[in-house]
Amino acid sequence: MRVNPIIDAIRFLTDSPLFYVFDLLVIASLVIVAINLQRDPAQRSIKDLSMFALRFVMGCMWWQQSLWKLPPTYTDRPDGTGGLHDWVSKMVDGAAFQIQSDFVQYIVLPHFQIFAPMVYAIEVLIGASLITGTAVRLFSLLGAAMAINLWLGLYRTPYEWPWTYVFLIAAQLLFFILDAGRSLGGDALIARRLERTHARYGLGSRILALIT
């Protein structure tokens, strides 16, 4: 059967590892959208619906990318080869700057089982954040940082197109600048609650306002 986006989407929703977690995130996202639409008529706009759609799709991309680096090996093979380990190894020769190449070769790869869970957890959290629209400002910045690492780390790798990562960086920064989580996301619910309770002046509330 010829692979096409529709078949890929169906397989992604039904055959992927942890598909049930993804389905729960989608359900949570739709519930949050419904609550926002019911409570805030101002969000019933093309702008907010479009921002939600773009944020949701980007979150799905991050979630999908986490699926080929699942624990316990964080690779796509039982023997621990391929997957994340293979792509990290490419940074030794493909990094734009020697300092990043040396860091990968002498620090990251010898301690792969320490760094791999961190990469996996961050990607899962970025995906969950963008899908549900929660703490989007924080995780958009983390997503931009991850994309910068890929851009510079794979800059000289054959057949890689560096602009791919530049566009990803730009998208993540736009989500941060435009407060994408406040368009039909969990951040909108948090912001309204802080406004309603006048609790936004406390330290914890100020931190919460910064990351949402």
Report residues per predicted region.
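Transmembrane-helix motifs of polytopic, lipid-linked glycan transferases
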Residues: 125-129
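Extended, low-polarity transmembrane helix blocks
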Residues: 1-121, 132-212
